[in-house]
Amino acid sequence: FSKNPLISKDLSYYLPPAIDAFLGSDSVTATLWAFQEQKPFLLVDIGTNGEILLVEENKITATSCAAGPAFEGKTLSRKITGSVTVDTLSKMIEGGIIDRTGLILDGANYGESTEDVKGFLNQEDVRQLQLAKAAIRAGIETLIKESQLSINKINNCIICGNFGNAL
């Protein structure tokens, strides 16, 4: 940092350690930042890995899941960003192109509002996104079950990370 003219020489900084191989220091930092939230709360960092932390008054429990590649567009037929993927999927659902199970309907009426998304995601892309969402949900449900909390007792769910910020 010392050679970068945009960073003050008097700046103090701290790079926290990772919690584990799949729970990085970004999750530590986000949890510390959010610690003033009313507990219990969930912090979900959707990045390369899906990192999920349940923060209670006297305990933090964490897990990770393989959600990042689909939301980052790495496993999809078109290499597009996660936020564009989610936006496209949303438009396809709203337009009746995808049914409640995630099946892309043959002969769906694309109409004006959804014509721009026609063919943008294929069936395998939709399935990859469903698997990623399911991995995050399973992580959340596991943390809540292990903590013996009711989902209704969770005060907040903070979505963070680069992808979370784009949502």
Predicted regions and their residues:
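Glycine-rich phosphate-binding loop of actin/hexokinase-like ATP-binding domains
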Residues: F1-L6, Y13-A18, F22, T29-V84
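Catalytic cores of large soluble enzymes that bind and process phosphate-bearing ligands
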Residues: I19-L23, I80-T81, F120-A135
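Phosphate/ATP-binding catalytic cores across multiple sugar-kinase/actin-like superfamilies
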Residues: S27-A34, Q130-N152
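Generic secondary-structure signature for well-ordered alpha-helical cores
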Residues: Q36-K39, N58, S90-I98, E141-L149
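Gly/charged contiguous loops adjacent to phosphate- or pyrophosphate-bearing nucleotide/cofactor binding elements
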Residues: V86-A132
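Generic long, charged, amphipathic alpha-helical segments
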Residues: K118, L143, N165-L167
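Glycine-rich phosphate-binding loops at beta-strand->alpha-helix junctions
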Residues: I154-L167
